[in-house]
Amino acid sequence: MQVTSRRRVTHLTAGQAIARPETLVVEEPLEIRVGGAAVTVTMRTPGSDFELAQGFLLTEGIIGAREDVHSIRYCAGCGEDGANSYNVLDVTLAAGLGRPELDVTRNFYTTSSCGVCGKASLEAVRSVSRFSPAADPATVAAATLQAMPHQLRSAQKVFDSTGGLHAAALFRADGTMLVVREDVGRHNAVDKVIGWALEQQRLPLRATVLLVSGRASFELAQKTVMAGIPVLAAVSAPSSLAVSLAEESGVTLVAFLREDSMNIYTRADRIG
């Protein structure tokens, strides 16, 4: 599966028009099915799709561990020509786990513009979260945290050629980078990271930091809580609802993270 494509563009500069090739990030739909029933469709950059699906199902409260997934496969014959498009995959849950109700799964938040009531959102997250970040005693040195954006940026290989991808990375509290994923959607990048952790049987993600390349929205805070991550850091701004959820859930929320500064919105006791 390709993550980039090439296209000729007309570049205007200093009054001159120059035709040249440009690299674009690929964006394609991914339909996630559970037991043959469609649960969601997300626009994503192809790659790490199984991680994406498992991270999504974990953060939706549908699964809680790798053992909850019996198998994952791409659905053959979904392309217009009958070929495998690799844009539809089906997750078979382990025996004893029922297929999720579609109206329940649709109560969750795959975009930041769904208009869900804030109070209802907070209550929904509390009711399905299997892990409690609040009790995590982990601490992170401020200097360690401030070094993370550079590590993340250095690992963004596709961004270098396209300039069009979000990224998420998981770090140990000592600053060791565990994994980084890029995607056209920031929530997809986070789901891929969490799906990787689930496959590695690392959940709950105690003593870790989730760093995102953009802003900290409610949906990213929700995914942080669902994975048991104690620290969420962002290079850009947080939303008010993200701060509220972090405060209620005991997550340390850091934003505007720079090499020499940061804003700590909740649980500042974890930052030394």
UniProtKB/Swiss-Prot annotation:
Q: Which InterPro entries match?
A: Cytidine_deaminase-like, FdhD
Q: Which GO terms describe its biological process?
A: Mo-molybdopterin cofactor biosynthetic process
- Where do the catalytic residues lie? 114
State a single Gene Ontology molecular function: sulfurtransferase activity
Q: Name one GO cellular component term.
A: cytoplasm
The alphabetized UniProt keywords are: Cytoplasm, Molybdenum cofactor biosynthesis
Location(s) in or outside the cell: Cytoplasm
Q: Name one Pfam family in it.
A: FdhD-NarQ
Entry annotated with the keyword Cytoplasm: yes
Cytoplasm as a keyword of this entry, yes or no, is: yes
> Which family, according to UniProt?
Belongs to the FdhD family.
Recorded hits in PANTHER family, A to Z, give: FORMATE DEHYDROGENASE, SULFUR CARRIER PROTEIN FDHD
**So what does this one do?**
Required for formate dehydrogenase (FDH) activity. Acts as a sulfur carrier protein that transfers sulfur from IscS to the molybdenum cofactor prior to its insertion into FDH.
- Matching HAMAP family, A to Z? FdhD
Q: What is this protein called?
A: Sulfur carrier protein FdhD
Q: Which organism is it from?
A: Mycolicibacterium paratuberculosis (strain ATCC BAA-968 / K-10)
